[in-house]
Regions:
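Glycine- and small/polar-enriched repetitive beta-structure motifs of secreted/surface proteins
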Residues: 1-197
Length: 197
């Protein structure tokens, strides 16, 4: 009786193993499988992501044309369609759809949310969190709109050349086109508070 029980257990284990080995080649998470890693600690996934990467290191491009023109830039992360598409600057992070779209030489920028910092060209050390936050920052290309922080949808949206501004809340300082240095704004677009230091 003991021998019969042992044979049944062995047969069951054999059948389970056979089924597993038969199914393993057909199981895949995605098709086609991810491309894997590239030289210099770089990762790319998506149509034309990191297409023109040169000697740049530590870049991650995920999404359609993400970091397309990266060249020799370093330590950039673009996640989402069109993020950092023209970027050649360093240390930028863009997550969403078309964040830092026109950024070329700007560095140390962070954009999270649809069209956040989308028109920034050469300004640096800006943070925008929320849809359309700081959307027009440095759209003149002069590189003067630096050290700005915009948190909330449409916060600091119209800023072109103002520097050292902080806007927190939906629409905060959204209409300030050429803000003076160190403006602070909080609240929604209906209740806009601002304070210049």
């Amino acid at each position: 009786m003991n021998l019969l029980v042992e044979l049944k257990k062995a047969a069951l284990v054999f059948l389970v193993a056979l089924v597993c080995f038969d199914l393993v080649p057909t199981i895949q998470a995605v098709s086609p499988p991810p491309d894997g890693c590239y030289p210099n600690y770089t990762t790319a996934e998506g149509c034309n992501a990191l297409q023109h990467l040169g000697a740049g290191i530590g870049n991650t491009g995920v999404g359609w044309y993400s970091l397309f023109s990266a060249g020799n830039s370093n330590f950039n992360t673009g996640v989402g369609a069109g993020t950092l598409v023209l970027n050649t600057g360093n240390d930028n992070t863009a997550v969403g759809f078309t964040e830092l779209l026109l950024n070329t030489t700007g560095a140390d920028n962070t954009a999270v949310g649809t069209d956040a910092l989308a028109l920034n060209i050469g300004a640096f050390t800006n943070t925008a969190v929320g849809s359309f936050a700081a959307q027009n920052n440095d759209s003149s290309g002069a590189g003067h709109a630096n050290f700005n922080t915009a948190v909330g949808g449409f916060a600091l949206q119209a800023n072109v050349d103002g520097s050292e501004n902080t806007a927190v809340g939906a629409g905060a300082l959204g209409l300030a086109k050429r803000g003076r240095p160190q403006h602070r704004g909080w609240g929604g677009s209906r209740r806009l508070h601002h304070h210049a230091q």
